[in-house]
């Protein structure tokens, strides 16, 4: 229970700061009042199981989705999920299409200069995925230098690949990157 409370408090920090990313002078109280007055927390989310995905009935489920639901419940409001294009997350916040982004996010300078962020609640890593039957061929950084990588547009993975000078095909979702590998 203490861990859930800590997670909810961290999420409140994200909500209270990211909900009005273009107006940092607004207080957490006014952001909270804004959400409670309208009765709905609008959450920007992407489709990437197991963190966020829609089940057979179209309901958003997964670690992030479930945490967002619990947080909205603690505020006494409903939650509405809006699937966003990851590369447009800052625009979505600034235009108030969404109140917050609830998703794994690498804290790049672009992200931290555009919105307030909570402390991390999980740690992820960048990985290279290749077909299983080719994995033995790609064991070193040197062995992948001539590959073309698929990465979600606007992601930390895309930025890192570009910084390293690799050939990158931007895709609209992480699941699309996986489909490129499978093709």
Question: Which sequence ranges carry the predicted segments?
Answer:
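Short, low-complexity disordered leader/linker segments with a strong preference
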Residues: 1-39
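Extracytoplasmic small-molecule ligand-binding "clamshell" domains
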Residues: 26-104
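Short, well-ordered beta-strand segments
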Residues: 42-46, 129, 147-151
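Solvent-exposed loop/turn segments at secondary-structure junctions
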Residues: 48-51, 87-88, 106-110, 134-136, ...
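Ligand-binding cleft/hinge of the Venus flytrap
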Residues: 53-57, 68-77, 141, 154-174
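Short helix-initiation/N-cap motifs at beta->coil->alpha
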Residues: 80-92, 136, 154, 169-183
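Ligand-binding "clamshell"
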Residues: 109-122, 166
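Flexible hinge/capping segments at coil-to-helix
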Residues: 131-148
